[in-house]
Amino acid sequence: MMSRQLVFIGAGMFTVSMAWMSATESTILSAIRTSPEARATYLAHAIIWRDPGALSPKDVLEGPVGAFPYTYEQANSDEGIECTFAQAGKELGGSSAKFLCRTADGHDLRLKYWDPQSRTGNREVFGTVAASRLMWALGFDAVPALPIKVRCDGCPENPHTGAGSRRTRRYVAMLQAQWPTPVILSNGRVDQGWSWRDLDTAIRLLPRGLERARQRTYFNALTLLGVFMQHGDRKREQQRLYCAAHVDTEAGELRADNVVTPPLILLERPGASACPTSAVTIVDVGATFGGAGRESSEATAKMNLEAWERKRVFTATNGNECRGELTVSFRALLDGESNPVISEEGRRFLVEQLHRVTQEEVRAIFRAAHVDQLGPRGPDGSPEAGRAIDTWVAVFQDKVRQIEARRCQPAE
């Protein structure tokens, strides 16, 4: 999978020192720029699912090997990772609580954070880890995320705004990798992304045959997984189309572009094909394991056990038509495909993949996500990790049973 061989670049969610980058930056393409028609073809044929191979509970807990400069054990030790406050989150873009912290060895860590004392902060800290771990374990592509305990020196009382007195503060945080490159674009926006309707339509326009049937099955399984996780924040910039193989630079013209990092793109010639294997990934799965909704509310759409438990997997319909129960955000609109239709082939395929994930692996997912921070506290005020994990696992397994019990109409 992409996540097992990820190359990091020096911009975005995870930034590293220029010394680290200097050896590789000049040879990494940021993007392939092509025509809308060629991009639609890349999208139709893109890898949606790959067999993740055999994973143990320990593998699931630790996450993709080599994706980060720290192991799970290092990042989640009692001491955690020490860094110095570098920049307020409001200066980094976006509205969710975050900040930039610099380590002694020069790593700039862009962190979404949660204050375990006040139990406030960014709930995407938990949702991103849980969702990306689950997708990876099932064979679907998502940008990896590392749970991390941080000791921030010189941290203001509010690290997102930069306001308040400064002292050493401890947070439960999440470090996310940059998305894979080169992305495949048909315009000048590196975050062009793709919508669920785009991918749905591209597959529908494939010639009848084995490839279209396979792509439809994988797409419907991924769609159903999104319903399962209540991933409603499905605007197009949350997804990427990228080249998952060696790029043929002879198929176009290399050009410098200072808007992107690394500053190098390939302008694909008409009729040429620079990428032999395209793939799709989801780059933001933070608003998951809640109740979704038009606003992607911090309180209910992101890692909220009660809201997630209340959501059934399927809507009530007549006959065998299956529609997932999912309200997408306003920004996704029609392109996000609310209450999506699920085929029997897609349902069955997802069930098969879910059966490969053992209960201990599910426990590892929620342990990695630090759901204990959201659960009940013991008499001494400390989180009751085992009890919290048990509750999340029980709801997870109930949703699996809902999918197992349903029968849907076959794809066209």
Residue ranges and their predicted role:
Residues 1-9:
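Bacterial N-terminal signal peptides that target proteins for export
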Residues 3, 16-86, 103, 371-412:
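Regulatory N- and C-terminal appendages and interdomain linkers associated
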Residues 8, 12-18:
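Hydrophobic alpha-helical targeting segments used for export or membrane insertion
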Residues 75-191:
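Conserved ATP-binding subdomain of kinase catalytic cores across diverse folds
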Residues 83, 101, 152-155, 243, ...:
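Cysteine-centric signal of extracytoplasmic or virion-exposed proteins
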Residues 123-128, 192-303:
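Conserved kinase catalytic-core segment
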Residues 136-140, 227-230, 401:
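Sec-exported extracytoplasmic/periplasmic mature domains
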Residues 247-261, 267-412:
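C-terminal catalytic region of ATP-dependent kinase domains
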